Amino acid sequence: FDIADEAKKIGIPFEGHLPVTVTAEDASRAGQKSFEHLIGILPASSSRSEELFQAAQVEFAEELRTHGRFDELHDSKLGEEMLDTYSPRRVEELSAVFKSNGTWQCPTFTLLHMFAYGDDPALQSDPRVKYMPPRVVAGWHPDELDGKRSPQDFAFAKKEFQRDLEVVGAMQKAGVGILAGTDTQNPYTFYGFSLHDELGFLVQAGLSPIEALQAATLNPARFFGKDKDLGTIEKGKLADLVLLDANPLDDIANTRKINAVVYRGNLYARPALDAMLAKVQALAARPLIGKVLFKTIQEQGIDAAVTQYRELKTKHPDDYDCSEDEFIGLGYGLIHIKNFKGAIEIFKLAVEAYPQSYNTYDSLAEAYMDNGDKDLAIRNYQKSIEINPGNANGIAMLKKLNSQ
């Protein structure tokens, strides 16, 4: 609550995840402007919400003691009781508190659906995967989701998802502000496409098509206090528009039937949009430079890999995925197998390619430290902090090195 008090003093709104140690009502009264992912909402919607809250505190302490983390209540033994004691009356009471305090809800159904249906082969074979980098999709397999969830976990999450839909529909009817969010970069939240998925889930929850559209347009404008400039199509407002071939008020799925986009005064007709999608698909299909270089390191050594990278960048500058993540992932992979000198050379390439990224210097510093080169480790941690004064890891490691 100290954060809430300080935010009030300096006039900064705060929002985010509901902490497990705070009730939904208390967070709302303290001024939390929005809740993300409906965290804590279903337990608060139980006729035994107080008992569940207290039991969760005990479980929270035990999980921290034994595992160093706490999975949400929906993953605990209290989950079934939470669903069995769901109370529409409690939802009405919660909604009244939220409406009175101006507390919004951002369900991110696209994310919640992934947790519930991540084991569904249809989801895994979604054709939109072709627009995603392979290194991102690699972590989307059910065995990789949320700590290797069991079939029982997925079965429970499916029941929970249906209840989440019901809760949001009830809150909308009660006048609670709803925001369309997607938490993009999580599994199966496809860039751009996921907002259309979210609109569909909002309608499934009971919102009308116009209410779902407002959750993605007018409501965010109001939430940020920008409704004088954004949120509706009116004279004098910013004219960033999506032009459709069919009416979304008849069927929310019609938001996908895009004819053109107007953005910052530029018109992008369907052929231009299709060309953009084709480019994204081509970029996503590029070979990963990390995988290419690792093979060379294994077969010929780090010097050959560095030479190979420079040749590829000269002769085929756009044909490989040379994102920062590729260098960082490869470098830490080399650290993992204790090839510290190799990691240093890879992180040097990362610094060369991304000189304004604090993380490249932070990673290079770690490799130097692991290799026993304290002075160069300090120098690079200092550079990372120079770029990002809030780099907590760099600050901590620099303090540790300077004390040795």
Residue map of PLM features:
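Residue-level recognition of tetratricopeptide repeat
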Residues: G200-F201, Y332, E366, K400
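Active-site neighborhoods of metal-dependent hydrolases
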Residues: I41-F201, A205, P271, A278-A284
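Helix-start (N-cap) detector for alpha-helical repeat units in TPR-like alpha-solenoids
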Residues: E324, F340, Y358-N359, A392-N393
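Acidic, glycine-enriched loop/beta-strand segments at the rims
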Residues: F190, S208-L213, R222-I258
